[in-house]
UniProtKB/Swiss-Prot annotation:
InterPro entries: AA9 (IPR049892), AA9_LPMO (IPR005103). The keyword rRNA processing does not apply. This is AA9 family lytic polysaccharide monooxygenase A. Its EC number is 1.14.99.56. O2 binds at H185. The gene is AA9A.
């Protein structure tokens, strides 16, 4: 085989290997029932793909959204995303297990989840009208040996799955759950972070009243956020705001050095304290509130603590 063909074949195989390493949410489990995600490696090639709760995308290369695209609608639910035709019921306070395809262990980074109220039918919602509030975040777990142990590593260890608890205080309605991994292995370079957003439709039931206004998807991040432009082999800053009070992941502040970020996340009214505790990535401290307030982040993460969930 001529050397030029060998070189071309090597390049193709290298690209295929890289692409194959990236993932997407293929299945969702709620109250013991399984729901298919949007199978981007299968459905786009079918003449009549099934209706699912996952949002369709054109990211057939299993690629990512780069920081240079953060003001583009693709950051909301991935490339050219369109709403899922179905919604899955879940009670406020219930859990949603998101099962990814195999995630590469080299792609270290946080795992973050948001909710946005569709204020109507999620199957026809305009994604640019959605406003997201963060309900769950995992980041740096152990920085003893750089690049450290990350939420992505925890996801891999859990058979490539991540479980999100729906806030017990959230008002009932139709919501989009935006769930993503941000790979930071190349984030020391400008435009090097890699966002892999995934969206599913939920019908949340319950008697909660919390209705935080949230943040538009195109305003969740900037390309120079401390948690986006960062060398994980040296330091880390949390990507975007705090987790809403009442969520499964609570947050607190402890940092040897810190920087502030633009407030983007809202905190809902607090629920009565429970005895449940969860491991929290150190990102911010939210004051006790009785209404919706804005929180300014402390973004440098240096430790992991255990705190009581409200």
């Amino acid at each position: 085989m001529p050397s030029t063909k060998v070189a071309a074949l090597s390049a193709v195989l290298a690209l295929a290997s890289t692409v194959a390493g990236h993932g997407f949410v293929q299945n969702i489990v709620i109250d013991g029932k399984s729901y298919s995600g949007y199978l981007v490696n299968q459905f786009p090639y079918e003449s009549n793909p099934p209706a699912v709760i996952g949002w369709a995308t054109t990211a057939t290369d299993l690629g990512f959204v780069a920081p240079s695209e953060y003001t583009n609608a693709d950051i909301i639910c991935h490339k050219n995303a369109t709403p899922g035709a179905l919604s899955a019921p879940v009670a406020a306070g219930g859990t949603v297990e998101l099962q990814w395809t195999t995630w590469p262990d080299s792609h270290h980074g946080p795992v973050i989840s948001y909710l946005a109220n569709c204020n109507g039918n999620c199957s026809t919602v305009d994604k640019t009208k959605l406003n997201f509030v963060k309900i769950d975040q995992g980041g740096l777990i152990d920085d003893t040996t750089p690049p450290g142990t990350w939420a992505s590593d925890k996801l891999i260890a859990a058979n490539n799955s991540w479980t999100v608890t729906i806030p017990s205080t959230i008002a009932p309605g139709n919501y989009v759950l935006r769930h993503e991994i941000i790979a930071l292995h190349s984030a020391g370079n400008a435009d090097g972070a890699q966002n892999y957003p995934q969206c599913i439709n939920l019908e949340i039931t319950g008697s909660g009243t919390a209705a935080p206004s949230g943040t538009a998807g195109e305003k969740l991040y900037t390309s120079t956020d401390p948690g986006i432009l960062v060398n994980i082999y040296q330091s880390f800053g949390a990507a975007n705001g705090a987790v809403a009070t009442g969520s499964a992941t609570a947050v607190a502040t402890t940092a040897a050095a810190s920087a502030t970020a633009t407030p983007t996340t809202l905190v809902t009214s607090v629920a009565p304290a429970s005895s449940t505790s969860a491991t929290a990535v150190v990102t911010t401290v939210a004051p006790a509130v009785t209404d919706v307030v804005t929180v300014t982040d402390v973004v440098t993460v240096t430790t992991v603590i255990t705190t009581t969930v409200l």
